[in-house]
């Protein structure tokens, strides 16, 4: 099986750590990053845990095989709604939210039938935040 094209939506501690872990394990053919802040996008690219950045959510997910939603739970509904039409058939989507009922409601309301959603939670973190805070080892032994 070919390595997947992965998109990270949100590149704070968890998103950047996922990117670092994917890079360390050589697990993706390409990693695209997206955040609302242009500063965060540029930092992510310069740090190197993504291969490219997208200027829009729709552009970020268009070629993705897997999409990680690394954003606060309260933002997931709007993100899923905004990206739904741009998802390619067969895409797998997962989240890192701490609760699932509102996430599942958003997914049920907006995600197209040709996409698969796997709810998740990394059960990891630190007191730090932002793209500079991420590190591949955050998920080791978890």
Ranges and model annotations:
Residues 1-62:
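NAD(P)+-binding Rossmann beta1-loop-alpha1 motif at the extreme N-terminus of oxidoreductases
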Residues 20, 24, 46, 81, ...:
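Short, well-ordered alpha-helices that flank and scaffold nucleotide-derived cofactor binding pockets
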Residues 28, 88-91, 113-115:
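A short helix->loop->beta-strand "cap" motif at the edges of active sites that frequently abuts
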Residues 32, 54, 93-94, 118:
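Structural detector of well-ordered beta-strand residues that form the stable sheet scaffold
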Residues 36, 71, 96-98:
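Short beta->alpha hinge that forms the Motif I/post-I loop of the SAM-binding pocket
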Residues 39-40, 75, 100-103:
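Conserved short alpha-helix immediately C-terminal to the canonical SAM/SAH-binding motif I
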Residues 57-92:
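Rossmann-like NAD(P)-binding element
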